[in-house]
Regions:
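Short amphipathic alpha-helical "recognition" segments used for binding
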Residues: 7-13, 96, 143, 182, ...
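Hydrophobic membrane-insertion alpha-helices, especially the h-region
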Residues: 10-28
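Short linear S-[DN]-x-LW-Φ motif typified by the pepsin-like aspartic protease active-site region
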Residues: 29-130, 135-147, 156, 215-219, ...
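Short, surface-exposed interaction patches in beta-rich subdomains
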Residues: 157-160, 164-170, 174-270
Length: 270
């Protein structure tokens, strides 16, 4: 892809995100208004009332798909779920636990919560999270394979351990990942501010979209090789500006970094 094509690509991404967000906002407002007229107060969330459900500990797959609820993953003594949103539906199918939000109200002003408690010593096989306009807060998560599809809300993830592979599709909000160890990361940062502080092992692909990105790599610089390509954006590694089609380092952990529109700052935290 030529530099001009990359410029067009990233401007198109930014414009598309803006148009999609505007259209969804208008549709959601209209549907919410109609729903309130016909349903009265039925759309209200049961505030301050958490429904606690304990789940069998043999879960190894977690699938979450919500549109407006805030997602919180916390450490607990057993695997369980809390929610104050009556439109949250959940079911266990063997070793898979699936959570969905039945009502599509992307701009729910009630700030409903979906809280998942996971024992600190539990490592799940697969976790998939598909979020809408709500926030995501993760205190600790250990998983072999991770798939995150982020929406418009802010994301704060701490103590993330991914042993096999991780796919993260960034949205339009601010995303912060810290104190983490990730193998074979495929990251599309989306639009907005993205910050990650982690040991990134194996072969990884980081695609920076529009905005500011800070990548703090844990470990020595000799452990990494970074292949840089860029369009309009700027890339700096350990304080040095990097040209297009540059290769930094010769380590075992390889990162293909594609910078779009904005800036990418890479630091090594030894």
């Amino acid at each position: 892809m030529s530099e001009f094509q990359k410029i067009i690509k990233y401007f198109a991404i930014a414009l598309a995100m803006f148009l999609i967000f505007s259209i969804i906002s208008g549709i959601s407002f209209g549907l919410s208004l109609v729903g309130n007229i016909f349903n009265g107060n039925d759309s209200e969330v049961l505030e301050d009332v958490l429904e606690l459900v304990e789940i069998e500990d043999n879960i190894n797959v977690l699938d979450i798909s919500v549109t407006s609820s805030n997602i919180l993953i916390k450490v607990g003594d057993t695997f369980k779920i809390d929610t104050d949103n009556k439109y949250i539906d959940y079911k266990q199918d063997g070793k898979k636990f699936k959570v969905t939000e039945k009502k599509h109200n992307l701009f729910n002003s009630n700030n409903s919560k979906l809280i998942i408690y996971i024992p600190s010593d539990m490592t799940l096989d697969d976790v998939e999270i598909d979020s809408g306009a709500g926030k995501i807060d993760v205190d600790k998560l250990s998983v072999r394979n991770l798939n995150l599809n982020l929406g418009a809300g802010s994301v704060n993830i701490d103590n993330l351990m991914v042993f096999n592979s991780a796919s993260i599709d960034g949205g339009a909000g601010e995303t912060v990942i810290k104190n983490s160890d990730i193998n074979n990361l495929e990251l599309d940062m989306g639009v907005g501010r993205f910050s990650i502080t982690a040991t990134i092992l194996g072969n990884s692909d980081i695609d920076h979209g529009v905005g500011e990105a800070i990548i703090n790599l844990l470990g020595d610089a000799m452990e990494y090789q970074i292949n840089v390509s860029k369009g309009l954006g700027s890339v700096s590694v350990d304080g040095k500006n990097i040209n297009n089609n540059s290769i930094i380092g010769n380590g075992m952990n390889k990162i293909d970094l594609d910078c779009g529109v904005g800036s990418v700052v890479v630091n090594f935290l030894r």
